[in-house]
């Protein structure tokens, strides 16, 4: 017997039915904002993620050397891949570029609630504009997608920050000390809520801050008063505060400002983030970890050898999103749905298949017996797949040129002329023919 690998999951049809509904809602919402679907490879060069995603990613990669001696990895995230794609055809692509993609990713990390080694995300990205409305549109897409799933303002919140505020405050507090590892300090901020206070301060001191500097830095992060932050910081902070305010104003214009709160302790751990960053959380706190996050990464395209191209994106993950939806009671029902089951009795398959073909032409879900089962077994199967209507094609009925239509919810049934079904109805029900 072969066991399933730790951190990997099987999805049987009922669960996939619910997952497909959620993915469809995410992708449909993205389409309504003008995002176009792209497809991406499963393997990329290992070095691309080591170089672009930052410290710590290398130990999480499912990496190996292929038969050609190339170091490759199963992709752990999508942003470097879509950045490479933009560079490959940068001159031919109309700006702004708006892409969406849903696919699996792989990271060898600690398995816990809402976190697996194979996981699925819907990535939504905009390339080619630094206008704050682009950041706001990413936030608006995310908010609308969650609302379309049935969530409300009491269910989720976006905690919004700006990487330049963090780096500018670090520079101000340390008097532009060149020995400060700004990226390491920001990675420490990203871990702040997940580790003990002593460990967090230890990471800041490891990044070059003194104890007093680390304390002052952390005190500033806990304020949401942008006026105070602007007076304390340098010109970088002042500019970043203005940009963050512009994004929040645009978010208000798009009608989703109620979901956004300033939270300077939000940092995002990947090194390529540059400007506005945000994370989505369960507003009740019951789901403690971040549901998903995103932000601006204006330098990534240029670092791949392309023309300077601002970019911003978000990536809702299905695993943590399912926890939020289940907590709020809006996760889709995990059960099969079937429009019609055609039950055959005796040598009636030619008539049954004709009816099935005509119903399927109109996009109905139709099953027909393919196992030569008894009447009772077929009815039991129809019930197990939640068939709404059972069409009984029996030899005796056909002698009278009739078939039986049974409503599985009410149990009512009636006979109709076989040539009259399905007739002019795309999806005829018992009520249509009675």
Swiss-Prot record:
Chain residue ranges for the region called Disordered: 412-434
Subcellular location: Cytoplasm
UniProt main location, coarse: cytoplasm
Pfam family for this entry, one: tRNA-synt_His
One function term, GO molecular function aspect: histidine-tRNA ligase activity
EC number(s) given by UniProt: 6.1.1.21
GO biological process terms on file: histidyl-tRNA aminoacylation
Family: Belongs to the class-II aminoacyl-tRNA synthetase family.
Protein name from the UniProt record: Histidine--tRNA ligase
The species this protein was found in: Haloquadratum walsbyi (strain DSM 16790 / HBSQ001)
Organism phylogeny: Archaea, Methanobacteriati, Methanobacteriota, Stenosarchaea group, Halobacteria
């Amino acid at each position: 017997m072969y066991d399933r690998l730790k951190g990997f999951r099987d999805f049987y049809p009922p669960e996939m039915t619910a997952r497909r509904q959620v993915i469809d809602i995410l992708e449909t919402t993205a389409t309504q904002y003008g995002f176009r679907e792209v497809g991406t490879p499963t393997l990329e060069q290992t070095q691309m993620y080591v170089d672009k995603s930052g410290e710590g990613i290398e130990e999480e990669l499912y990496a190996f050397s292929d038969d050609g001696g190339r170091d490759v990895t199963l992709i752990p995230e999508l942003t470097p891949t879509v950045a490479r794609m933009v560079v490959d055809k940068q001159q031919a692509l109309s700006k702004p570029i708006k892409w969406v993609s849903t696919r699996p990713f792989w990271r060898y990390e600690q398995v816990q609630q809402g976190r697996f080694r194979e996981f699925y995300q819907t990535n939504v990205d905009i390339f080619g504009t630094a206008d704050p409305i682009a950041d706001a549109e990413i936030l608006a897409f995310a908010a609308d997608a969650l609302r379309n799933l049935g969530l409300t303002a009491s269910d989720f919140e976006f905690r919004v920050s700006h990487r330049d505020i963090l780096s500018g405050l670090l520079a101000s507090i340390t008097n532009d000390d060149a020995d400060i590892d700004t990226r390491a300090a920001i990675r420490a901020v990203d871990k702040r809520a997940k580790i003990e206070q002593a460990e967090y301060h230890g990471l800041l001191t490891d990044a070059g801050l003194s104890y007093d500097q680390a304390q002052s830095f952390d005190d500033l992060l806990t304020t949401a008063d942008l006026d105070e932050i602007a007076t304390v910081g340098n010109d970088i902070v002042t500019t970043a505060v203005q940009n963050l305010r512009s994004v929040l104003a645009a978010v208000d214009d798009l009608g989703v400002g109620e979901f956004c709160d300033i939270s300077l302790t939000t940092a995002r751990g990947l090194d390529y983030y540059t400007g506005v960053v945000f994370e989505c959380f369960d507003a009740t706190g019951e789901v403690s970890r971040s549901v998903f996050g995103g932000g601006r990464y204006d330098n990534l395209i240029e670092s791949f050898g392309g023309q300077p191209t601002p970019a911003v994106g978000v990536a809702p993950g299905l695993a943590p999103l399912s926890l939020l939806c289940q907590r709020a009671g809006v996760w889709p029902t995990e059960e099969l749905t079937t429009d019609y089951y055609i039950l055959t009795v005796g040598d009636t398959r030619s008539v049954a298949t004709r009816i099935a073909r005509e119903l399927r032409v109109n996009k109905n879900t139709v099953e027909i017996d393919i196992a030569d089962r008894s009447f009772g077994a077929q009815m039991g199967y129809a019930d197990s797949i939640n068939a709404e209507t059972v069409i009984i094609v029996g030899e005796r009925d056909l002698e009278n040129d009739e078939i039986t239509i049974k409503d599985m919810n009410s149990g009512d049934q009636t006979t109709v002329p076989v040539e009259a079904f399905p007739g002019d109805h795309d999806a005829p029900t018992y009520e249509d023919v009675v």
